[in-house]
Amino acid sequence: MEARYVIFDLDDTLVHSDAVRAAFGVVAEEMGVTRASMSSLLDAMPGRPAFEIFLALGLRRAAARAAAGRFLSLLHDLDSELPTVAYPDAASTLQALEALGSTLMLSTGSSPARAARVLEQEGWDAFSLVLGSDRETLKGAAHYEQISAEATSSDWTSHAATIGDSPRDMRLGAEHGVPIRIGIDRDGDASALLEAGATHVVSTLSDILPILTAA
């Protein structure tokens, strides 16, 4: 296996938590939207930044940014009540990739502070770049621009892989020329991931290792 840049999503890829949906639910109710409606929207837009979720509810950009700020504040508080839990194979998978010489990067819709807190909680210090989302920078093209600025070669994407649970992760990878796009499907329906450009779909995180080793 050649040394690769491996870009990971965070929530529902490396870790899981009830705090994210709980925070969205509280903000939804404050806006007069039912938790059930918000849950359906989150199912339809997995992995999207909070700002985009609130835009999809019909809010104007300024109101959506304010709602996203409220969401992040609630998420910070709820994290202590509803702790983030790593998937059982997350640590060993990251360790294996580090041993193979991979450059690990994190691109998440969560805030930079929460991303850093989760990595510290789990003792995951192998990530060379940790990109969160806030009012200035959202997960998406802006994160790829930051990765390009940090990469040691201009053709870094040709030696990259992206790992995530949402169609958006796959779409972003395809749009930016990442050849290996691995979707994590733990629900048994990979159609949305494949339609969005996933080159591989796995059900557990450790299943990415044979794919990356053979590439």
Task: Go through each PLM region and give its residues.
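A short, structured active-site edge motif that brings together acidic residues
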Residues: 38-43, 124-139
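Glycine-rich phosphate-binding loop signature in dinucleotide/nucleotide-binding domains
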Residues: 1, 99-102, 150-158, 215
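Active-site neighborhood of HAD-like aspartate-dependent phosphohydrolases
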Residues: 1-41
